[in-house]
Amino acid sequence: MRRLIALLCLLCLVLALPLSGLAQKQEIPDISVLDEEMIPPTPLGMKHYLLLCMDSWGAKMNNLGFSDGMVLVTVDEVNQRMITTSFIRDMLVLHPDNKPGRLTYIVREFGVQGLVDTINRHFGIEIEKYFVMDWSQVSSIVDAVGGVDLTITDGEASYLKRYAISPSSTKPAINSGGRYHFSGHAAVIYMRTRRVPALNGDPHDIGRTYRTRLVLSSIAESLKDVSYEKARAILDSVMKNILATNMTTSDVLEAFNTVYAMRGTPVEQFRLPIDGTHKLFIYYGGDSQLMDFEANRKALKDFMFGNTFVVH
């Protein structure tokens, strides 16, 4: 009987132990964000458009999953600049409920506007307009502009040859590193590649963001001499291949006319996070990237705005 009582007492002591004694306590990351009133206004003549691609070939607005590609297109009419800024999907941020989590999860839980608001307060910008699409729609858009010419490495060529893409989806068929003309489907597979470094050496998700920016800039370069009529036809195809936008018809036409007037302008590229400002962080068992947001806000401000205003 005494032995049974002793065992029961020991069991009670074990059950009374805090969970932190049985498992490693999750470290709470320090993430710096801005209050809404601290976000500086967008300079006159500059517009931001968030291009958001869902991680699906058949996304539905009433059941959106994870966001995969997130690229900010900035059109600066005053200074004649066009900029693409990409965001890695696994960066650790504060969600709209102020709980930490990966950027890719926000749309599923808080909607597209929740993602826009999150990017704004983490990076000190005022995104107002967005386009939402999925991978099949991106494929159709690339086909609508006539495909895209891309230079790939031997490593990328080897990976793409093993992937389920038709040899006829590039011209010529991929054999080794070199320059190829990609169809829409092949371009999507290329942009999603993460197992081999990109042309510039960037690995993993950072390499994926580089490939996306490269496709966008390559398309822009191919359209520098496009006629107005052809450009309008491409715009019609683009608008037929989006899930959603918060832009009115007037907004779209205004943006189109501005971009058309600036055709031929070199597309500048930027990536968040910048080198040396992020590290691997395990959050509840999943890999994420913990960033120095103050350093990234300053870098974005310096690149995009110069001395127009100060980002705290």
Cite the ranges covered by each PLM segment:
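Sec-dependent N-terminal signal peptides of Gram-positive bacterial secreted proteins and lipoproteins
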Residues: 3-23
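C-terminal solvent-exposed extensions
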Residues: 27-40, 44-47, 59-60, 64, ...
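Flexible, polar/acidic helix-loop-strand segments at domain edges
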Residues: 40-45, 143-230, 311
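Extracytoplasmic
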Residues: 44-47, 65-70, 79-87, 98, ...
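Second-shell loop/turn segments in exported
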Residues: 57-62, 100-109, 124-129, 177, ...
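Soluble non-cytosolic domains of exported or imported proteins
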Residues: 63-67, 97, 105-114, 132-136, ...
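Extracytoplasmic/secreted envelope proteins and their assembly/folding machinery
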Residues: 67-69, 100, 112-120, 135-139, ...
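Amphipathic, coiled-coil-like alpha-helical scaffolding segments used for oligomerization/assembly
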Residues: 109-171, 248-249
